[in-house]
Amino acid sequence: MIQWFLKYRPRSLKDVENQDGAKKELQEWIESWLNGKPNAKAVLLHGPPGVGKTTLAEALAHDYNLELLEMNASDSRKLQDIKSVAEKASVYGSIFGTRGKLILLDEVDGINVREDTGAIQGILELIEKTKYPLIMTANDPWNPALRELRNKTKMVGLNKLGKYPLRRLLKKICQAEKIICDDEALNYIIDTSEGDARYAINMLQGIGEGYGKVTLDLVEAMARRKERELDPFETLRDIFWARYAWQAKNAATSAQIDYDMLIRWISENIPIQYDNIEDVWRAFDALSRASIFLKRAKGGDWDLLSYAYDLMSSGVAAAEIEKKKPNWKPKWKKYQFPSYIQLLSKSKDIRDTRDEIIKKLAIHSSFNKTLNDTYPFFLIFYKKYDKRLSLNTKEKEYLNSASKS
């Protein structure tokens, strides 16, 4: 099952509505590149979610016969990630017989500058060295972390999709998918979407596929549900209890946690939710396939992310055969945190205790030198000096354990 917002996205610039100014700026920019005199090496394409930033970049590549290399900056964020994927592409030629390449870095405002050290610097270096045009997208271009990028790029803003173009698009989809949508429901979707075409299309698909008809009552119920993100426990319950694919998919896409962590949560709790061993097998089979699609998506083919979400949500939900029976009722189970998180937490606690001890030792030496040269010997005879170091109970317990291992 492909998401409708991907299925019906414009393939050419002429099909992109309500963005005439942005289209003109992008065309002038790309033509300056093709003529060998770029007026800017990179463009920062910005606008609210769902207005078509990625779609516009893809349509530009299509119309000018450019090979598009797409990379999600908020998932491949460290300096080495940026360099290894994007920089190589900027140096080597295309193998597809196109006129050249267009590099797309999606969601640069999703970069966490504290955790992803060097990512912004990596992008700045890429802008300086690239031999091909570079487009970046951002919902919030005024993020302080993007200041240097703003100074090095041509900024192009996108408008929200107007009500009339959005209405035409939704009616076209209803006709193509043979979905009946009441006028009141259509108006409600358009009003609540606030120009976010992806949100509107996803809502239309979620209800249309589940019920075959889109009514105001159903739309209002879904809109209330999507006003807040679901915590992991709510997400699991909605996925495992879902009887329809769209219900499970909505739960997954409304989760507070990202797709990597969601897979860990689902994996940990499949054996808890499903009693039948065959149901467990089918659920893990769907989850393993989701992991494969997710890995391929991270390799640059982000359209595959939709399939990963389908499998980790709808695929897992459909694993329980008993759901097909009319009298089926969901079983309440007590879900648990992934053991992976618990191990990480325990490991961090151990490292923190060790580091506090090393800080006490490293009075006349650096931390790293003490860790590598002094600490291994200290474990052997630490009991002679524990009082002088003012070790607390937790640190003593750690040293007792470490000296035995």
From Swiss-Prot:
Keyword match Metal-binding: no
Query: Do the record's keywords include ATP-binding?
Result: yes
The source's superkingdom equals Archaea
* SUPFAM superfamilies in the cross-refs: P-loop containing nucleoside triphosphate hydrolases (SSF52540)
In terms of SMART domains, this protein maps to: AAA
Q: Which is an annotated GO molecular function term of this record?
A: ATP binding
UniProt KW keywords: ATP-binding, DNA replication, Nucleotide-binding
> Tell me, which GO biological process terms does this entry list?
DNA replication
Cross-referenced InterPro entries, in alphabetical order?
AAA+_ATPase, ATPase_AAA_core, P-loop_NTPase, Rep_factor-C_lsu, RFC_lid
| Annotated residues for binding of ATP | 47-54
PANTHER family xref list: CHROMOSOME TRANSMISSION FIDELITY FACTOR 18, REPLICATION FACTOR C SUBUNIT 1
Tell me the function of this protein: Part of the RFC clamp loader complex which loads the PCNA sliding clamp onto DNA.
Which NCBIfam families is this protein grouped with?
PRK04195.1-1, PRK04195.1-5
Per the record, the similarity remark reads: Belongs to the activator 1 small subunits family. RfcL subfamily.
Q: How does it assemble?
A: Heteromultimer composed of small subunits (RfcS) and large subunits (RfcL).
User: Could you tell me what this protein is called?
Assistant: Replication factor C large subunit
Upper taxonomic lineage: Archaea, Thermoproteota, Thermoprotei, Sulfolobales, Sulfolobaceae
